[in-house]
Amino acid sequence: MTIHHEPDSIVLHHPSECNGCPNRDHCSESMFSVKESRYVVDIEMRANVTEHRILCAKGCPKHEKYIVGSFPENVSAHVQYGDSVSTLANILSTFGAVSDSRISTIMRNLFDITISPGTIVSMVSRCANKVRDRLGAIKNEIISSEVTHFDETGIRINGKTLWVHNSSTNKYTYLTVSDKRGRIGMDENGILPKFKGIAIHDCWSSYWKYDLLHGLCNAHILRELKGIVDNRPEHQWPKLLCELLHDMKSAKDDAVGNDYDTVPLNILDSFDNRFHCIMEIAERECPPPPDPQVRRRGRRKVGKERALIERISANWVSMKRFVHDMRVPFDNNQAERDIRNVKIKVKVSGCFRSLQGAKNYLDITSYLSTAKKHGINAVKALNALLSGQSNIIFSDPSE
């Protein structure tokens, strides 16, 4: 562990022989030298109360009248909570995924501060209102990016299932909520309708409705292939395709490590040849079912294995895009990481009580996630936000 600042206090430990020595008072400190130092890092669990007083003056020699001072703009009530309390409450609510009632309990137990869950909701709401000035800039940065990751997950709001839509890059995160998982919810998120780059996703059908270049999450496909290997061990095609995807990833990693602009053409051709051979095996091992005697409306049921074969065959160009374009990743882990905290929040705290509460949480999480990607920790980012300096999240801390 590293000590990041000078010690706040120093405790000296004299030799045990000095304790009770009749000559101790005659020994000067210059007789002693430091043999070894050890450090104990601790925190103080207490509230800090600052009293603000405005003063008045009678008979000022300059103004010759009664003059009165004024309180700072941020000191507006007789008793109020400071920015540090609001910062901690918001961090616990977002990154900590703690419910409002538990935040109230934590504050009372740690600092002997009694804050009602309603007050915590108000703190989060005020913070979210300040964050929204920055969300437009975050959104525009993602729209103008070359590669963006997309994902969605369900949450419960007041007993109803709604959907969180995530759009993110390695520098920016933008989260919104909608009652629709598909095209309507994606349009409400506002990124995909204006996006012109490469969209990375898990092959959910609604993403294909946008006229874009697409890249698929091959880690997701590998998980599906493994499921087939476990359930149908006699089939060879899923094993062969897993090996092919791993070989493609290794080739991409080697190309990046050698600063190549692309994977060599002969290697790319060999990947295509292997893929087509594997698909021929897949057709033999799991052929399409015969046409039903009675045709019914809707999509024909073909089983999970056959559905995966058809999906992979139709989207091979998007699957292999990561070896043709060095900007495209092998998987969609970026989006999954950025949306993971939402899943943790739901698991730990349960459902949101209101749609506005969910929006507040997602707006603050978008801001804090973006700040983290720029090397700025959550405490510094929220303190900057509350003091009107939220542009700090777009700065480079190394400069």
Where do the PLM segments sit?
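Short, flexible loop/hinge motifs at secondary-structure junctions
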Residues: 1-76, 121, 150
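Catalytic center-proximal scaffold of phosphoryl-transfer enzymes
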Residues: 1, 57-59, 64-399
